[in-house]
């Protein structure tokens, strides 16, 4: 099957998901991050040279994904339908573009291009808030504060500083995942190295968010030290540190896996 034939077949089977994504983009429902990830995804597919031009696309797996997409469309589950459709596209493109069954970094970009943020907040928000509060406690105790964790809050004396939903770190996690995917594509990380990078990125985000929570607590409880108390400014500063750590970690993975293929076959 030629690449053009596979693409036309995918468009014919995924027209409802394509229209749904286009409607979100044109009506302003899509966030800027989703559009950025989608643009990066298309750019990767367009610019990547065919590593194995004679490789056959994963037609069976892609067909199953498209069947799931059709079922989800029938049940009026547009996000699941779109996720299945882009999974099928990645399965069709990966063998020839990257020489593997499924190129995980590109697949990750495709998932980030969808409206997954509310679902990440729903499923991961509370666990991340718990982890943030738990890790912030020893940081603050080391700074001399008698702090204890109270659920997702930091208790000091009679007051509690809550780690609420906006401070869960979900947006930082999304941005870190985008950065990881871009770096992994550029460095041609293998599947195992990318999986290790994902675990390391998650750990760095949790630690970075705990540092942000501790800094905000310190800024509110000890304003005389002049620490910047703006949530946005502190968030940007901590994310810059976290992003730098992710870049260093990916560089280490690249050096360790320099001779690996773009992904495991």
Locations of regions flagged by a protein language model:
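Membrane-interface helix caps and helix-loop-helix hairpins in membrane proteins
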Residues: 20-28, 70-82, 95-99, 119-123, ...
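Extracytosolic (periplasmic/ER-lumenal) interhelical loops and adjacent juxtamembrane/interface segments
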Residues: 6, 10-11, 120-160
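N- or domain-start disorder-to-order transition segments that initiate the globular core
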Residues: 1-28, 37-54, 260-265
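Hydrophobic cores of alpha-helical transmembrane segments in multi-pass inner/ER membrane proteins
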Residues: 35-47, 84-97, 102, 106, ...
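Active-site beta-strand/loop microenvironment that shapes enzyme catalytic pockets
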Residues: 72-78, 85-99, 106, 168-224
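Membrane-interface transmembrane-helix boundary segments in multi-pass integral membrane proteins
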Residues: 29-30, 161-162, 168, 196-200, ...
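A loop-to-helix transmembrane entry motif
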Residues: 24-31, 159-178, 182
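Cytoplasmic-side transmembrane-helix entry/capping segments in multi-pass membrane proteins
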Residues: 53-63, 79-87, 99-113, 127-131, ...
């Amino acid at each position: 099957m030629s690449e053009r034939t596979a693409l036309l077949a995918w468009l014919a089977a995924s027209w409802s998901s394509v229209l749904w994504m286009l409607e979100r983009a044109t009506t302003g429902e899509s966030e800027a991050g989703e559009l950025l990830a989608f643009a990066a995804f298309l750019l990767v597919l367009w610019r990547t040279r065919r590593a194995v031009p004679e490789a056959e696309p994963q037609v069976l797996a892609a067909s199953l994904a498209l069947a799931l997409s059709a079922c989800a469309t029938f049940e009026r589950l547009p996000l699941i339908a779109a996720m299945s459709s882009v999974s099928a596209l990645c399965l069709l493109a990966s063998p020839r573009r990257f020489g593997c069954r499924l190129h995980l970094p590109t697949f990750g970009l495709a998932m980030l291009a969808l409206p997954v943020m509310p679902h990440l907040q729903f499923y991961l928000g509370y666990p991340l808030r718990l982890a943030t509060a738990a890790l912030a406690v020893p940081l603050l105790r080391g700074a001399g504060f008698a702090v204890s964790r109270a659920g997702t809050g930091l208790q000091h004396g009679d007051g509690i500083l809550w780690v609420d939903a906006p401070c869960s770190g979900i947006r930082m996690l999304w941005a870190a995942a985008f950065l990881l995917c871009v770096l992994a594509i550029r460095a041609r990380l293998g599947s195992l190295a990318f999986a290790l990078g994902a675990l390391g990125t998650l750990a760095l985000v949790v630690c970075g968010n705990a540092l942000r929570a501790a800094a905000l607590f310190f800024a509110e409880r000890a304003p005389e030290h002049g620490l910047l108390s703006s949530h946005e400014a502190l968030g940007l500063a901590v994310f810059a540190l976290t992003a730098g750590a992710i870049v260093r970690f990916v560089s280490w993975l690249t050096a360790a896996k320099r001779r690996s293929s773009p992904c495991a076959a």
